[in-house]
Amino acid sequence: MTVHCLGNGKVCVYGRGADIFQAFGPEYSSPDAFTLSVCPEGGVNEPAATVKHSRVCFSHTLGSLKMLDLVPPGSSDFYRAVTGNVRFRLTLKNAPVLDLLSPGTAMAVTEPGAIVYATSFENGRPHGYTSNRFRYILIKTDGDVVLRKTSDTELEIAVSGRGLLSVVFSETPEGLFSERPDPEIGNLMFSYLESPPDASPLKHDPRINPARNLPAAANSPFYKEILDGADVICAQQAETGAVLAGYNYHLSYVRDNYGVFRFFLAAGAYENARRLLAFYMSVFERHGRIQNAQGMSESAFHIHENDRVEITGYLVLMFTAYLRATGDTETVRKALPLIKYCLLSQQTELSTCGTLPFNGDETYIAGGLLPRSAIADGSMEATALFHRAITEALSVPFIKEYLGAGAADLLEAAKALIENRFTANFAGENGLFYCNRPLEDPSEAPLFRPGGVRACGHGFGLSFRNKNGDYVCPACLSLDLPPLFPGLYGKRFAVEAALLSPCFTGSQGLIPEGLTAKAAASVRDSLNSRSRIVGFEYGFLMYGQGFDRGLAELMLAQRDRFGAWSEYYDGGNQAGTLCRPWETAVNLAALIEKYPEE
């Protein structure tokens, strides 16, 4: 079933039909708060017809039963208005239900220690980054509703007529009660729910349908599709500026946010873009580093192999592209320490043959299209990205001045080395161009890694290289484990779709003439026949070959009915995480930026 998302920057809710399976508040990257499901024994056992009204408002119809969900802009509340007879089960995920404060009112307190981001599971229990804050939840019902506590973590909500459920989030008990549900919101929701939506005077009420400011996309023939996709993306943009990577990834992933950032620039949503940059600046100011992913409010990190490469290149390109689009030198000057960190982090990882390794969360590795045995190899994509980042950064006089002559000279030398060796490193026989350059000596791989996937299956974290070259947890290091990737160690891989990544980042000048067009043609021909493709491949292809209407129609046909692309497509069907900002952003940015080339 299609996944949808309501979000206002403070409260984010993911649902399938009328059932809610994740909810976050009073900010994103916080412990999962509750689920809300229709009880089938309550007389309703059919899937809901769900309609999106805006990024903060969805309605559901099940026969004569009508529901409207809303997270009003600027509030820390979630509301569901109901007309009809139905029972719901509300299950709190990280807090017990306190005794009912009064009829129709309950409260829960999530204490410090609740999981924000799980890195592993042992005996069914999650381990990882935990919250260091109290969070308070007020659950209130009004109208023809009976609220009943059925267990330590569950509430039953029985509606027989006209009822309103309100869930209020706060970080303080005082805030919880000072921000009690707004009675006007209930009146607004019932007025909207009980009138034909297209005829309702409330259709354009900013509490139901907040404004969308995408001036650069306004003249696009795909404007409606762009607006739908913008809702998917902006619902998952936190008040802090960063964007979730979807319901399976509750942090801000740099690569995903780079794609989102490109969409913001392409659509002219410069304030959204500036807020995203401000988030990464604030993380760096607090922690002095950027990892593969970071918490949006809590100090949580998803640390992967080789986090000093690839993601650092994306960050540099975000700042230089923003400067070029807006002329906002003030923001970019504030980011100079971060830009320098990103450039020199990559420079220290550059091999003597002019390559950077793979980041452990690189798309084709994460999706299983490249084995994890290749992570320490030279990466065509990361290397080209570093080259582009150097070129862009050194072209801005005040960035070059801040770096200083010594650092600038190091980067110029790195750029020259990459250029001189790039074709030799990645070109092969018969016109093939490879994604990786295997290590000449496997012992060059690091003895341990501070983060990333453990080959032994024991989650993420510190791992050590065993005799097979696989990275395992300390407890498994002395075990006689079989090789995880038999026959794949030291092998070269040619994933043609990966050749299109430099077209997206502007690094295609390093690819030998004609190979990009050849790769694009091959990828285009195989889109319908390959068993698995990544969801942004359509957009990358459009950046590689230019706009064509057939590709645009094929790409748009892969969206779900709310306007989102998924993480992967298996046999043409959505797979992995649905309702994804990154894939949606890349594909829409391509539609905006490449359409004039028709």
Regions found by a protein language model. Give the residues of each.
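Terminal accessory carbohydrate-recognition/targeting modules of carbohydrate-active enzymes
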Residues: 1-218, 255-256, 265-267, 596-598
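C-terminal capping/lid segments that line or modulate ligand- or cofactor-binding pockets
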Residues: 1-31, 35, 295, 302-322, ...
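Well-ordered alpha-helical scaffold segments within catalytic/enzyme domains
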Residues: 209-217, 258-270, 314-331, 385-402, ...
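Active-site acid/base region of carbohydrate-active enzymes
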Residues: 211, 215-229, 280, 285-287, ...
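Asp/Glu-centered strand-loop micro-motifs enriched in Gly/Pro and often flanked by an aromatic residue
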Residues: 214-217, 228-252, 262
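Aromatic-rich carbohydrate-recognition surfaces in CAZymes
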Residues: 250-353, 379-387, 552, 578-596
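Catalytic cores of carbohydrate-active enzymes
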Residues: 290-293, 355-358, 375-380, 384-505, ...
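Generic long, charged, amphipathic alpha-helical segments
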Residues: 507-536
